Regions:
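Short beta-strand element of the alpha/beta-hydrolase
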Residues: 48-57
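Active-site glycine-rich loops that stabilize anionic/oxyanionic intermediates
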Residues: 56-61, 129
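Short beta-strand-to-loop junctions in surface cap/lid or active-site-entrance loops
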Residues: 36-48, 114-116
């Protein structure tokens, strides 16, 4: 039994001796110093005045802004809905950072409603993964004037 174990151990050691471990960063932006919004407006003939603020996920360590943000724009725009993707700061121990960024996004979208041809009373929020947590936090804990309509 000892010999089988030793043989198996050395066989595995030999097989993995050439294995190289390479550290990779998770996809998406890191160390966002300044939050930002990217606005995707529908064609004027399709526009309904409705908008959705999208909060991408990423486990509060990075943002998956492409597949959980920007890639949704054509879907919403074809339905006449503006999509506004929020790049929020990572908390790094301060949970108020992403919350304040999302609250500011809601205020900016409402304040810019005339410029973007939006109805300030028809602004929603959505998110994926950690972004979904952020969206639900804004929907339930923000001051009433900063909460989404849906």
């Amino acid at each position: 039994m000892k010999q089988k174990f030793s043989t198996l151990f050395f066989l595995l050691l030999f097989l993995f001796s050439g294995l190289q471990v390479v550290a990779q960063k998770a996809p998406g932006p890191f160390d966002i110093e300044q939050p930002s919004l990217r606005v995707f407006l529908p064609a004027p003939e399709l526009a309904t005045g409705r908008a959705v603020v999208a909060c991408p996920g990423g486990g509060y360590s990075h943002l998956a802004v492409d597949h959980e943000g920007y890639d949704w724009a054509p879907y919403f725009n074809k339905q006449g809905i503006a999509l506004i993707v929020l790049k929020y700061r990572m908390p790094k121990g301060d949970r108020t950072l992403p919350i304040s960024d999302a609250e500011a996004a809601m205020k900016i979208v409402r304040d810019s409603a005339d410029v973007w041809n939006l109805n300030p009373n028809d602004i929603g929020i959505m998110g994926s993964s950690a972004g979904g947590h952020l969206a639900s936090t804004i929907a339930t804990h923000a001051r009433p004037e900063l909460r989404p309509n849906f």
